[in-house]
Amino acid sequence: MHPKYALLKALVDRETTHVAPGLRQKLEEMPAAIANWITDPFSFLDHLDTSWLHGVNKKLHQIGLSSSPMRAFARSTLWLSIKPRQILPFETVLAFPMGNILQHPVNTVIEGYKRLGLYDLALDARRIVQTDILQAIAASLSEDQKAFYKSIQHMPTPIDFGRLSLERWDKQPSTLQTVIEKRGFNRFAKALYPCHPSLKWYLQHLLNKDKAAMFNSLCTDVKNKNAQHTLQEEVKFAFKGLL
């Protein structure tokens, strides 16, 4: 063997004695986020709202949810077709501040941001003196909403997004619930403004396309550090017990 090839072989053999153990490292010895990503790098597809899928992608999604031998190929192809180039792995984003929101069903996320709308309701209710309106508000809330409302009713918040105009409310529970959801979604979107772009991308794709577009338009800077911090604390408190 030529000396230079012998030297190269010796170097390769020497290095592989150090590399091989690392390659054989068991998944359970790795950080959970890395191990989960290696096991299934396309796990977010289980959470993806189907409004993002069309034609071939919808068929790929159906195969990806099955036990078909084509499952891995379908998930890989679908994932590469929808994800932006710079997106971080889903498992990594779950470990970010606020990231745990992403690992729960979309109905739980909706319930969480609807709770946030009760902060707006509490602010407006302090300005109302008409007993009939206050009674109608109480009658329109679910038991969970009543309990949460009671816990934050007198809690100060440094940011006010304006009146709900409850004096002109028709006293229909469905009307109030719609307002609460819209206001809560606004707080939710603004609270997540400082979050990593990957987290916001995953959240938007957890929601349907219309909700995602609304989130994108509402996710703006409140330009007040104290208010921004409080909004994030409100999100954490609203989701507590749901997550």
Task: Locate predicted features.
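General marker for long, soluble alpha-helical cores
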Residues: M1-L243
